[in-house]
Amino acid sequence: MFLCRVPLSCKEPVKMYWNKSDTNHCTVVAVGFKEVGVDIEYMRYRRFEDISRRYFHKDEITDNMHTFYELWCKKEAYTKWKKGKIAKYMSQKIDKDMTQLVPQSRYQMTELDGLPYNIRGYLCY
């Protein structure tokens, strides 16, 4: 894979960050000048209540497909942004607006638009 066919010339090296996620024949690559984390998931029926009971905070247990994938994608994008372990952040409750996992962390969470109707995704930066 080439990002550029012509080598870039600059006096100082440019620090770039990237992250990728793929699901069901769909791939997203996020590139930026600071840390990024991205996650997309193909939404299909699962036993959401059982899965959320096992992995999410007790207040986040849900049987709703859209809520489940929203929480899952946000937590996974955040984990990738932090370069952390998924088990550590999946069980942490996110705030009312579902944007902040760890209050002292400074980041932004954005829902990805333009994805197929059955794929949900979030970008953390």
Question: What positions do the PLM features span?
Answer:
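Conserved nucleotide-ligand handling architecture
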Residues: 1-125
